[in-house]
Structures are given as C-alpha cells and as structure tokens.
C-alpha cells in the first residue's frame, strides 16, 4: 500500500494523471484517447471507454498489451434532455478505465480499485458503498474478506443493474459498482442507491467471464477480461466537494464565461437560468471535440448531432437574452481548458472556430422567423402540433426536430411524430425520383443465397486475364444451371481478374468466355467479398462448374487506375493547399471522370482550385513510384496512412503509398508511377450539403479530350461572333454593353406606354369624402411598369389616395399582377397595403406582400381578376366612408 502522505489530486488534470500513473505502475500500457468517430461502422460515436477495445474483447484484433489503461473522450445524446437539469448528466465526458485482456481478474481489479480510491484519491472507507450482482458470490467475498468491507456496505442487485452484456448473445458478466455516500451520517439501514442527492456511482468494474449462446445459456469464456470505467467529472465533483459536476474546474470556467456574456451571475441565478448556463458549458466541450475530430455540421449522422448541439446552444443563449454571436467565445475557453490533454484542439482551433461561426450565422438568419412560427403555434392553443408544421420548422428554418419537441414540451404541447416522419419520407421520395439512381440492389434468391458461396479470389492486381470456375448463375434474380444467348445474368466465379465495385471505384468491364460462348460484362458488384459479374450472353451458353476465361477491358481499367491514383493525389493536395483537416466524405472513381467529396465550410476560390490542380500535375510530372504493400492496420495508421471514416478494416490492410506525397488504406487498382496519370484537370467544384464540397475532375487522355472539345467550342464562338479567339472577351463585353443599352431603351419605351395607359386615370379617381380611390385593370405592363404607375398616381393624388391596379402582363403566360399603393394619411390610420394585397390575390389563387404603403402580388387565375378588384372596391369604399364620417 502507498503512503497516505501523498497529496490528494484535486484538479481535473491531476485526477486524470493520478489514475493513469497508478495503473502504469501496475504494468498497464497507457493508450491515448481515440477519436469520437469510432473505428466501428455499427456505432456513430464513441460512447464508452471500452469501445476502442471492442475488437480485442471480441477476439477480432490482437491485444496491444495484456493490460491497458486510458482516459477516453466519449459523447452520448440519449439523455440530452437531462443535461443541465441533473447534477451529473452530460453529452461529452471523459471515462478513465483500466482493462485486462485475459490477464488479471476479479481479485486484482477489486484490490487495485480500492487502493486507488483510498491511497491515491484519499476517499474515506465510511463514504464508500459497494454493489455486486446478487449471484456473484466471488466478488462479494473478495470485497468482504480481502478488502474488509463490512456486509452492511455491500448491496446485492439483480441482472438489470449489475450484469453487463454486449447484446443478446456474446461476452457478458457481472459487475461491481463503487458509490460515494455524501451523507454517511444517515447510517446504513434501508440504503437506496437511487437517491441521487446522497449517492453517486463513480467506478464500475465489469468482470467479463461468460459467453451467452442463442438459447440464453452461459458458459465460461476461455480468456476472462476486465473492463472498468470511472467518470472523470464525477470524481472531480467528489474530490472538489461540489454539489454538481458543472461547478468543477472542468466545466465551470465555460459556464462563467456564458454568464459574463449574458451579464448575469451564475451562483445567484434562478434554476432555469442555471440550466441554460450548464447546457452551454456541457455542449461547448462536445462541439469543440466533434469538430476537431472531423465532424462537419449537416442534416445527416454525426453532422446532425453537431448541428443539433450547436443550435440548442444558440436557443439557450436566446433564453439568456444573448442576441449576438457568442459561441466562439465559449469554444475558446473550452479549448484553453483542454488543449494540454488534447493538443489537437489547439492545432485545430482556427478550423473549430470557423465552423462554429459559419453554423451560428446560418441558424441566426432563420432563427427569428422560426421562433415566430413556434410562438404562433404555442399561442394557437393546440396541444398537438402537426407533423407538417414540425417539418416546416426543420426544413425551412433549420430547427432540429428534437429542438422543436423540447421547446413545445416546455409548454405541454406534443408533436405529431408520425406526421413528421411521413413528411420526411415524402421529401426523400421526391429526392429519389429526381436523382434517377441506378439500382444495384441484389434481389430475390441472389440476396438469400449469396452467403452460401465462398469469397471470390481477386487476381486482377497482377493480371487482366485469368481463369475461374462458374460457381453460380442467376437469371431474373433466380439461381439457374446455365446462361444462354440473349439472357442478362449475374455470374459468380471462384476467382476472377475483374475488379468488383468498392472503395468508390467502379467495377471492371470485359468478357467471360468459354469455347464459342461469350458474356459481355458491363459491371461487377461486390457483396461480402463475393463478386457478381453482371452482363449479357452474346453467344452460346455457359453452365455451372465450367472453367471460363475472364478478360478485363484494359482501356477502361487503365482509365479507372489513372483516376484512382489522381484521387489520392487530389486529397493530399487539398490537405496542403486548403487545410490539413480536409478528409474524404465520399468518392467515385469511374472510367470517364473522378468525383471527390470532402469537408470544407466554404467554396474553394479560383486561385485555390488552380493551386490544387498545379500541385497534382507537378506530382504527376515528377514520376513518383506507386508502392503497394500489406501491413498491420495499427502499424499503417501509425505510419500516417489515411483511413476512410466509417469503413471497416481488418487487422491486415492494403496500403497504397506515393512516398512523400500520399499514403492511404486502399483496395483499389492504381497506375505504377504517377507519370502514367498523364495530366489532371478539375472541371467543377460545388457544394452538395452544408459543409461538404464536391470536386469533379479528369485525368489522362480524358483531359486532352476535354481541351479538344473546349477548343472546338472556342472556334465555333469565334465564327459566330466574327472575332479571333484572342478577341472573344472584348467582343462579348461589347455585346453585353450593347444589350444593357438596348434593355434600357426597351424599358424606357415600356414606361412611355405605361404612362399613356395610366396618365388619364388620375382624372377618373372616385372621390369618397376627402379621399381619392383608383381601382383599375391595366394589361400589358410588367411588374416594374405597374409599380411605377401606382406610385406615380399616388404621388399626384396626394396622401389621402388609394391606388389598386391589376392586370395581365402577357396573355400567353396567363398570369396576373397586382399592386396596392396607399397615401401617408391612410398608413397613419393603420391601413396596410401588404395585408390588403394578400386578401385580393388569394381570390385569384395567388399571394404576395409588402410594406404598409406599398405591396405587390402575383396570381394564376386570370378569370377571377374582376372579382378581386370588385372585392377591393367594396372593402375600401366602406373603410374610406367610415374615415370621412369622423
């Protein structure tokens, strides 16, 4: 045991360091925190300290060491409604953990946990309560006999509380939890561990000793494991003697900064105000780590979680009467608090603040209008808001559904979630119909039988031609014995030279043949590493179990290889020219072009595009070799190889390396030297969603074809405009100036025509007391001319005039225009042109708006024009009469 003279760790940094130092002294390998974006496609975010070790626990990856310890950053949003409300709920938190992979077990785990909390953290035994699984007599005995915990301090709980499992089947085991008792003077009778004011669970020891089969039966694991977790924020609350986690040195500086911005004092604030301040403190830590780890705000996946947190912060800022931008101030405090432990925060600070500012400005642009709609819904008195309205808030004003629910629930109003889902699905269907994507889904018996086949051996890295045995044939989604002439089929071989579509690269084209039979292959789909060769039988027939020849189209393969290598070079260039945080969000390596999606908060400038293009072309001309090797995954990542987020990799990975330029995990095909790419040209750069940009580019012969086509276009323009290519800009500029002058002349003539049409109207104005009223139909005038006419007439008739004009600007287009103009006297009396024009245009299936003194609208139903003008005449006649009587 260590001497208790050692100083007690107090600050969050000291508590974290003491934990890791302690377990390092027990021969644990200290593992740095993994990203919040896990290397596990089944999980969106790192939600637990053990998640990075999940492949080790499941036997899918070699253990880094028999013993390990870490401080892992984690993020959960399942209890987001409790954040700031309770003393201990968070989205972002740090989990301190020690792990054993088939090494030590219960005795050591319990002894070391006790040594840590009593000798290092100096917690008093009388403040500690232990819980155990009621059937785990072994753990209870260790606590009682080895540690000396009296039976009254050991609480037996059932499987719901003290038995961990990874799912319905698989590794599982009992756990033992350590609780801190804030009020030990209340005694040990009738202890209720659910009493959150008295007890806090701060250390959980999981003893992974069983495997549960599909029948629910438990059997002993060959290797027993230890998985523990201690919440850093909870231990800080205990050691710093705070009433909640938010008042520890880990979060309070952010909370105080938020209070300073809001010009209030945290400690003297009421509970509702404190909740908003705590939410800002919690969410700040979450957003800076999400952005630093590469997440960009969007409406999908992790990006949606980030956007939801950011917009929730802005909303709580509004509740604190903060109107201006403020999130970057909180983020700066959060970064300064954590940058020593997480240096990436300091390195990525500029990008973090930029992303926050962009998203904050984006939401503020629509926040006022969205809040107005929300307030209208609340004032309506309805207790169930339609899914249509909730979707409008989401789609038009950027309110995440959860934020809308949260705001309305504060007023005891519910949201029609099924209706919202229907609206969302309808939007997806509209998008799907518009995109006209090719369906490569496996259907029918293919989907059912695919698992019956062995994985296809791919031989296409070294040769475009090979032999393989036909293992399966599918026609119209059904398994058949042979493929005959004219049929479109899917063929499965035991081995092939065809590349199957994956990693963004399209599948090869070519032929499968045998004697006089031949199949034209137009695409190859990969499903669970089984290759389906899709094509049409051009002649003869091919049967199952026959030996066939595979011949890949070398020209298409060469174009794909060129585009794939160019894609790797492009990503490296973007990281150097734009920002090192740029990472791939999607790609397509085709025969005729390449497409690369990446995170960027703003469009690339023309200069940046030119720099990226030039850098890629310089690497091409330098004739770098392409080195391909298989490596241990961890070694490859340590060497700097880039991995695609969300991709699942095995222990051994294929690495494509352009030494000194690019290094990526990649299963695709590539050229042998960069000079084989030939040349590179970016043809477009666009935004495809919030924070995500897309580059389309060409390489090799396709670049020459592109310039040839442009040259032909330039020559045609030269002939058309009767100017040499070098004079085209000058000629076009001259034509544009000419066009502007012609348009001005046309508008002048329109104004003259309009004047002739309306000039006589002022003399026919109806007098109602001291007021003048003109309501008339004038056809053939566009919106600008109709507006000029109304304003000119109002000016002539004075501040007690009303002018309403409606007409058909173009009989072929069959639409209506309306304008309403009020004199100043009528505006002072409360009349509003915008409101009136809405009523008028609605009669003709239209709509519009404007200011109190002037408004305009459009409409579709030209047959209702007279009805609309008559409605206006009657309405205004009565109002003007009432004003004249006063």
Curated annotation (Swiss-Prot):
Cofactor needs: Zn(2+)
GO biological process: alanyl-tRNA aminoacylation
Enzyme class: ligase
EC assignment: 6.1.1.7
Protein's cellular compartments: Cytoplasm
Statement: the UniProt record of this protein carries the keyword Aminoacyl-tRNA synthetase: yes
One annotated GO molecular function: alanine-tRNA ligase activity
SMART domains: tRNA_SAD
Primary subcellular site in the record, as a coarse category: cytoplasm
Pfam families: DHHA1, tRNA-synt_2c, tRNA_SAD
SUPFAM superfamilies named in the record: Class II aaRS and biotin synthetases, Putative anticodon-binding domain of alanyl-tRNA synthetase (AlaRS), ThrRS/AlaRS common domain, Translation proteins
Record-linked PROSITE patterns: AA_TRNA_LIGASE_II_ALA
Chemical reaction(s) catalysed: tRNA(Ala) + L-alanine + ATP = L-alanyl-tRNA(Ala) + AMP + diphosphate
The record's free-text note on cofactor binding: Binds 1 zinc ion per subunit.
Keyword Aminoacyl-tRNA synthetase belongs to the record: yes
Top-level taxon of origin: Bacteria
Domain notes from UniProt: Consists of three domains; the N-terminal catalytic domain, the editing domain and the C-terminal C-Ala domain. The editing domain removes incorrectly charged amino acids, while the C-Ala domain, along with tRNA(Ala), serves as a bridge to cooperatively bring together the editing and aminoacylation centers thus stimulating deacylation of misacylated tRNAs.
PANTHER family found in the cross-reference section: ALANINE--TRNA LIGASE, CYTOPLASMIC, ALANYL-TRNA SYNTHETASE
The protein's role, per its UniProt record: Catalyzes the attachment of alanine to tRNA(Ala) in a two-step reaction: alanine is first activated by ATP to form Ala-AMP and then transferred to the acceptor end of tRNA(Ala). Also edits incorrectly charged Ser-tRNA(Ala) and Gly-tRNA(Ala) via its editing domain.
Entry's family note: Belongs to the class-II aminoacyl-tRNA synthetase family.
Protein name, entry field: Alanine--tRNA ligase
